[in-house]
């Protein structure tokens, strides 16, 4: 855990926000989906870093950049040294340098989509060629 805390402190700029979500109100398996449904409060130019009490992961999400404040959900600006996980809360930290990292993430997602489309086109062409061969073969017989 010390490495993660050090990595967190070293990697963060003074502008750091912490969003708390009471995990008793959320199915933890659907945490990202739950967070991504929350909207209306925008943190511009920031990368979300999500800390769970039992672990750590980082996820770039467009929807996570918009937040709706509710009784169970609140946001606060925090000092650099307090950017660490909380015991019964999910803490979402945002750090600067969102723009490039998120653009890269979007490009990767677009690349994946393009590869899927290209693969679908290739398969469709193969099926079409097979049908043409079958049609020609049946005409010749």
Sequence positions of predicted segments:
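Periodic self-assembly scaffolds
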Residues: 108-135
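Short, low-order "capping/linker" segments at domain edges
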Residues: 62-64, 85-109
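Short, flexible, solvent-exposed loop/turn segments with mixed acidic/basic and small polar residues
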Residues: 2-12, 36-43
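Short, conserved charged micro-motifs
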Residues: 25-32, 57-63
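Short acidic DE-rich linear segments
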Residues: 135-141
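Short, flexible beta-strand-to-coil junctions
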Residues: 19-26, 53
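Short glycine-/aliphatic-rich beta-strand segments at the starts of folded cytosolic domains
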Residues: 11-21
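Short, intrinsically disordered low-complexity segments
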Residues: 40-86
